[in-house]
Amino acid sequence: MNRNARFRQKLQDPALMHAMSAHNPLAAKLAAEAGFDAIWGSGFELSASYAVPDANILSPSQHLDMMRAIAATVEAPVIADIDTGFGNAINVSYMVPQYEAAGVSAVVMEDKTFPKDTSLRAAGRQELVRVAEFQGKIEAACGARRDADFCVIARTEALIAGAGEREALARAREYEAAGADAILIHSRQSTPDEILSFVSAWQGRVPLVLVPTAYPQLRESDIQALGKVGLVIYGNHAIRAAAGAMRDVFARIRREGGIHEVDAVLPTVKEIIALQGDAQMRELERRYLK
């Protein structure tokens, strides 16, 4: 069973699937080592790693290159965050086969205008496209995939945009009808109330996807108990962990006047070399260097 088939099967299983964000192959490798079922190829994290806003400033090829490198590094299925699809349905038709060829098992596409503004930015510009327009994008994505197990996940930002639960449910139903394999419902409220209400009201056949960044008090056991959620995505925790660790270590080095204290709490150089695939290279040297 290939990665696409494994991802589709896991998405439909009663047991909750867990995906961790990544912005490079090293982060993906660490997430896989920690036991996450899938890797979320985060556009937010990639943008943050370049120190630019998550607003379609980076090119699609930069994100695609990241996806290709991650998929080549880990065995876990990779989910690509393709924002709004990089344009209209025609752009989607051209981009989906490229992501599939890069080794990605699913794409997540949101129903906002292009260029987008990041969902969790306070007072951000959150404009939704027409339902019919987004249905066309979903149909284009489904029509462009070559493997029937490759998943197209539709993300509605109706709650983010303040359009309310009724609009979010209506959009989700239309997106399911257009062929979406799952619905990602997003919220930036600090409590899970509107998400729980949406999940309770959802009567569709396809599973839901949650990203609990804004409401971290909702635990995996709580999500599992809802019964309609197939996947939870931790959408930005790799870059936040990395930024926090770097900030703390850099500050300590300046404060302590060197690395004599902080070095003991860092991963060793030997550990980093191992993460770089040193054992594989040594085996290749043994076999082929004569």
Residue ranges of each PLM-predicted region?
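Extended, intrinsically disordered, low-complexity segments
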Residues: 143, 238-290
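Alpha/beta enzyme core
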Residues: 2-213, 217-233, 247, 251, ...
